[in-house]
Amino acid sequence: MHRSDAAPASSIRIYFRLLSYVRPYVGLFAVSILGYVIFASSQPMLAGVLKYFVDGLTHPDAALVTGVPLLDGMELMHGVPLMIVLIAAWQGLGGYLGNYFLARVSLGLVHDLRQTLFDSLLRLPNTYFDQHSSGHLISRITFNVTMVTGAATDAIKIVIREGLTVVFLFAYLLWMNWRLTLVMVAILPLISLMVRNASGKFRKQSRKIQVAMGDVTHVASETIQGYRVVRSFGGEHYERERFRAASEDNTRKQLKMVKTSAVYTPTLQLVTYSAMAVVLFLVLRLRGEASVGDLVAYITAAGLLPKPIRQLSEVSSTIQRGVAGAESIFEQLDDKPEVDHGRIERERVSGRIEVRDLSFRYPGSDREVLDSVSFTVEPGQMIALVGRSGSGKSTLANLIPRFYHHDRGQILIDGVDVEDYTLKNLRRHIALVTQQVTLFNDTVANNIAYGDLAGLPRAAVEAAAEAGYAKEFIDRLPQGFDTLIGENGVTLSGGQRQRLAIARALLKNAPILILDEATSALDTESERHIQAALHRVMQARTTLVIAHRLSTIEQADVIMVMDHGRIVERGSHAELLAAGGHYARLHAMQFREEPAVAEGR
């Protein structure tokens, strides 16, 4: 594989794809280009005015001066300062139009890219989030997009403004003396070779910088989210060292990029100025063939060239940083969204669930998490799944709403394979409450009436809160249902957060309710109230309960005991106790533990 050969073509392809995001702003972009044309045209104007001024001083009777009626040579010469001011104003106008309108393009591009990237996150499958840390995903939206914007707009600004300046100056120099100008043109292949060589290094280093920046964001994100654990277990030193290591790695990679640029830019300047030195030497040989004004104008125009050439050479690093950032962004955008080939949509289902010979393993694993699982849940029934951690209970619950796709077997709702429902319609029929509660930095009411539930009346929200035994503590909050609860409900207790999650599920009023350790964070009194509330709402719903505390599922119609991905027992509470198998042993173990815990209190 010849990566070095493929990389430039790949860079061009990525860059042109990136520029496609500028298309909605083509009008603004055109105005900015016009501004830079105005700006660039002012450069040779200055050299021309100096030629006119010097020739006027040395030869006041020159035809250019005497050919203007009503004014003598010196009167015309007094107009030169005004011409310089007008050229500066012309240049300022061009700079304003170019910079302002390109900034509008740049800010729009940042918004569009971030929005597109965020929208893609909402469509990606669960497995994508399992394989990518939140820190790296956040870094793409923040750091990478900023780098990409630099390539798409800031780099264009330099390429257009300085590129046009070089074109105008070269055109002027060719018009003045094409033979001398060819000496400067001769260095362009060497400059091109240097730029190509540096571009590969810049892009490679930029990829490493973005990964390192993602590591910094990841460590910071984990520490902030788990700050209670960090402080409780004395992890401050460990996290400090972990962050320092990530930050130092990022700094080293940044410095390597700076070092490459620091060597590359002066080398390019040396080549450019060497060409200028040759030109100046040749100018001395032409003293008798050109006027003093011609020589001054030529030297002035040639002297204006190194700055734009240097800036054009430096823009390579900006472009390659952006291309590397765009590469990671497009990798995410090109990742396949959740598979949704279903076509069936139903207003409401009765809630009959049938699982046939279901098997599943996580990507990259050779262990079956679920192995030939089969069962049926009739509408309105309550089914409980119990078993040791890792037996496959939560995995089974995640397969019903298609958070993952099973390898073998079928899951049917009302006789229709879940794969045949559209994802949105399937999930509308399922309310899910897990042990890991997710709340948002918003009001209590907006956390209960979230997403598709946002338009429901306040009375329905309050009724759901009451049914979830949450209204009692909500009424004690400073602004009641309008109280802001902080990031992930940080101002609430674990039990309060879980009750809000249950209220949200109850408000959804879905025919299928999945409770995955939903009452694990509740105290005994709250759990008793919740169980009573759930008992009422379960009568009209098919309910799948995953529980560790067996006392919470004794009233289930069917209890299924799972072990190593298989259902090893099923029956009612009484039947399973009488059988003396897995369930009876789990029950006896908890029966011994609970009195001991109570005595310890």
Swiss-Prot record:
Give the main localization category.
membrane
Entry-linked InterPro entries: AAA+_ATPase, ABC1_TM_dom, ABC1_TM_sf, ABC_transporter-like_ATP-bd, ABC_transporter-like_CS, ABC_transpr_lipidA, P-loop_NTPase, Type_1_exporter
Could you tell me what reaction this enzyme catalyses?
ATP + H2O + lipid A-core oligosaccharideSide 1 = ADP + phosphate + lipid A-core oligosaccharideSide 2
Do you know which SUPFAM superfamilies this protein is assigned to?
Answer: ABC transporter transmembrane region, P-loop containing nucleoside triphosphate hydrolases
Task: Give the multimer and partner information.
Answer: Homodimer.
The EC class name is: translocase
> Which GO-annotated molecular functions does the record name?
ABC-type oligopeptide transporter activity; ATP binding; ATP hydrolysis activity; ATPase-coupled lipid transmembrane transporter activity
Role played? Involved in lipopolysaccharide (LPS) biosynthesis. Translocates lipid A-core from the inner to the outer leaflet of the inner membrane. Transmembrane domains (TMD) form a pore in the inner membrane and the ATP-binding domain (NBD) is responsible for energy generation.
Record family assignment: Belongs to the ABC transporter superfamily. Lipid exporter (TC 3.A.1.106) family.
Pfam families reported in the protein's UniProt record? ABC_membrane, ABC_tran
Instruction: State if Disulfide bond is listed as a keyword.
Output: no
Q: List where in the cell it is found.
A: Cell inner membrane
Domain (ABC transmembrane type-1): residue spans on this chain:
30-321
Query: What Enzyme Commission number(s) apply to this enzyme?
Result: 7.5.2.6
What membrane topology term does the record carry? Answer: Multi-pass membrane protein
What's the entry's take on its domains? Answer: In MsbA the ATP-binding domain (NBD) and the transmembrane domain (TMD) are fused.
Instruction: Pull one GO CC term from this UniProt entry.
Output: plasma membrane
Q: Where are the transmembrane segments?
A: 26-46, 82-102, 167-187, 263-283
Question: What name is this protein filed under?
Answer: ATP-dependent lipid A-core flippase
Q: Give the organism, scientific name.
A: Aromatoleum aromaticum (strain DSM 19018 / LMG 30748 / EbN1)
Q: What keywords would UniProt list here?
A: ATP-binding, Cell inner membrane, Cell membrane, Lipid transport, Membrane, Nucleotide-binding, Translocase, Transmembrane, Transmembrane helix, Transport
User: Encoded by which gene?
Assistant: msbA
Q: Does the keyword Lipid biosynthesis apply?
A: no
Residues annotated as binding ATP: 387-394
